[in-house]
Amino acid sequence: MGNPRCMSSLFASLFLAAVMTAAGAHAAPPSGLPASAAAWRAAAAADIEVAVQVTREHHPGVHDPNNPAFLANLDAARRHGLQLAAQVEDMAGYVAAVDGFNARIGDGHAGLAVRIDKTLLPKPRWPGFVTVWRGDGLYVHPAASGAAPARARLLACDGKPAEELIRTNVFAFQGRVAEPGQWWSEARKLFVDTHNPFIPRPRRCSFTLDGRTFDQVLAWRDIDSAAERQFAASSDGDARGVGMTEPRKNLYWVAMPTFHPNEAERAAYRALNREIADGRAHYLAADAFVVDLRKNGGGNSMWARDFARALWGASRVDAALAAFSARTEVWWRASPANTDYVAWMAAELDRQGQPDGAAWARTQAEGMRAALGHGELFHVERKEPDAAAAPPAAPVPAFERPVYVVVPGDCASACLDALDVFTRFPNTVLIGAPSSADSTYMEVRRHNLASGLAAVRVPNKMYVHRGRPDRQVYQAAILVTDPVWSVDTLLKVVESDLARRQPGR
């Protein structure tokens, strides 16, 4: 599997998604649901209490020397969640209370994941238009603007300024308000009504367009299939399938909409990397490359790393990443349940015909079991020394042409890992939005609750001295503020920057 030092990150992303799918299938929610308002209140409170207890017992953050405020933050989230739970009257209220608890924790790798069948919930509603955040406000997207003028900017609703409303109606229940990228991905949900009983649905909003201010009375209606298509079209635009195109001579567009590829997409990635490696002499003279990460929900960062090795040269990428992660350690929280999970993971990988992954997982499980036997909180994953290398090949010529990376606001997980790789090189230019951020708590298992309504997110490990610090956001060098994030819009941004770089400009 290449350098053993990469084993943790490689297998974590390559295998754990499939393993987690199998693990999550072990138990399905019961058919019986709480039958009264009192029962829903009791369920919300009980599930939040159990989530806190499970987190205390198994989450690595509880004993993280670099995060002494973890438990205080968890306790504050508990108090807030229980305040909401005490007001719950139905299923939608249960979901909202859990969301409020999670938002107060502020980490997507902690808290509760609701397991209720979405078809049982009331249909979400919308006012007949879609908005997108573009750095300084919400703008009506042209893809769905029938009930409000396209490109109009929201000023306020019901006398409440737009930003204040987004904080109370959106970020109090989802997303992470301190991360700029989350505004780009989450703020638009202001105009999606999920029947949250703790927030008022906007009734009358004011907008501005071309110097004119006007009011709009909102007419809420169920989101149907046509509306869903409009939401999809407005979310980061028209992302392409995995592969490379040449929108104009000598400018190459590389689409990476997923790092969790299916069989056809895996073949497309391999073909792309072969094309870059085999034709590298030609591509050294490219005007620019554009790497498009729109729609990328993470997965296995190996695909980005392999592309980078083909483009910049394997030895350069490997050396840059080795320096970036030279101090990184991986600490596995050695609780009995975490240890059992990693041991199960090893058996599951064996069953899937992944012997290298199974061996790696088994080593971690054995280390966790040994730590338990010694009363230690963590098993620290051992870094294997580099294997004896073959004599180095002559270095390939450096790739020095501009590489523009289109970053969506919800870029996280393996998408952030890709930015870790690409930004090792000074010819990389990030365009689009600020990214999201990750905590250092990873490899999440799900602890299903007896209620069947939710599962606790339990990371099994944490990074110490990671090259990218906890909660670090990648800022775009060029913000793309047009409401429409189409390929044409993004190409205009790239061409403008290329023109600026011309001698004499």
Walk through the language-model features, giving the residues of each:
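N-terminal secretory signal peptides that target proteins for export/translocation
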Residues: 1-8
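Short N-terminal or domain-adjacent regulatory/targeting segments
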Residues: 197, 227-229, 374-391
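Low-complexity, serine/threonine/proline-enriched polar segments
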Residues: 322-378
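Extended C-terminal subregions enriched in glycine
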Residues: 350, 402-424, 429-438
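Short, conserved helix/loop micro-motifs enriched in His/Cys and acidic residues
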Residues: 391-406
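Bacterial N-terminal signal peptides
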Residues: 11-22
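Extended, charge-rich low-complexity interaction segments
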Residues: 349-367, 459-481
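Flexible, low-complexity junctional segments that flank or bridge functional domains
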Residues: 27-343, 347, 402, 417, ...
